[in-house]
Amino acid sequence: MIDVDAYAKGVLDGKRAIVARAITLVESTRPQHRALAQELLTALLPHSGRARRIGVSGVPGVGKSTFIDAFGTMLTSLGHRVAVLAVDPSSSRTGGSILGDKTRMERLAVDPAAFVRPSPTAGTLGGVAKATRESMVVMEAAGYDVVLVETVGVGQSETAVADMVDSFLLLTLARTGDQLQGIKKGVLELADVLAVNKADGPHERDARTAARELAGALRLMHGKDAVWTPPVLSCSARESTGLDTVWERLEQHRTLLDSTGRLTAKRRDQQIDWTWSMVRDELLDRLRTHPGVRSVAPDLEQRVRDGELTATLAAERILEAFGDPSPGSPG
């Protein structure tokens, strides 16, 4: 039997074993756990919200795990308590790719001032993002004052992470020719700070050149009147150089948000967006598992595939089977 009060006290006391159990509870999709998880989160919510929430993404091969290990270790040496969470929609298929990352984060994984949590295997991006957001509440209530949320893998995970953090850090590499090559379309717009990693040895000069070129491109993209133009820095996670400057720029961004009132507004907007996102996910789940929908969906899908039925008509029939009348229809 789960004692929610005992869990809440253990989390607030910063007991690692209880924190891990609390996160397992909020990640659970079992109906009997969901009510208990919400009760626990309601108790912890007043004690959360004071941490710096930072999203970390990167181009393939950038050395994200090595960066987070070095960056997080630097932060704990400065007296911070660091939590690392991940949004990995593929984790249910791969068995949790950040499990491998955790072993690569050799220093943070054993640092008493850090907590590295594998990505929840919730299957869908919505499910993973929900579990990560709720894990963040637990981590903050437990006293972790820096939460690093890593994007792993595919699709819209960057956008999902940007919607739950204060600042978004994008890691990239020096490339010959086009410095924007390899950065997914749309991800650049999310970035608040960029860092060209692996600025060491023979690559150091290339990394500095790349940082200058990217900074110029961003100035053009954001315009002269932008309140914040994302700075572009060079760093080496392997040699732990330039990481302090990355932290300084992230702190400057947070200070700007805080001093203009945008931090509070941003977090409130994120909560409202999150509320409606959960409504959409829950409705979609109910619709897909509805007996009436399940009985008609295979035939309708086949008819759409065969070109016998338009997608719009198929959607209307699915909604009729769900028992949700169209707008304007009686009853």
Regions found by a protein language model. Give the residues of each.
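Flexible active-site lid/hinge loop adjacent to a nucleotide/diphosphate
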Residues: 176-205
